[in-house]
Amino acid sequence: MTASWGTLGHLWNKDVAIIFIRPQRYTKEFVDESDTFTLSFFNDKHNELSYLGTKSGKDEDKVSNVNFHVEMVDGNPTFKEAKEVFICKKIYVGKLEKEHFLLPEIYKKNYPLDDLHYVYIGEITDVYANK
């Protein structure tokens, strides 16, 4: 999955990554099944990342179509081509709620199908950098 909604910060005295995943995303199954998730950052590869963001791994082997190479880091999948990889331990999962939106136009613009994102907060436990 290519993510564009997320943030890094400090919460509950921990360095954290906060990510948002829609319920219909294939990636959600994998994140839900594991206690950890990875975030992979790239210097370039914009065309490849755009392709990955518009295709589902449920329908095709999209990773091989962009010639990325999966590798395991501390038992977690990432890509050899990534510049940096964050290993995150899940510490919170919740779902956005329609009634909590204070600006109705945000909800209307982003959720016409009422498919509200799930929020995952992960403690950043390791960071790896490729040279």
Sequence positions of predicted segments:
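Active-site-proximal mixed secondary-structure blocks
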Residues: 1-131
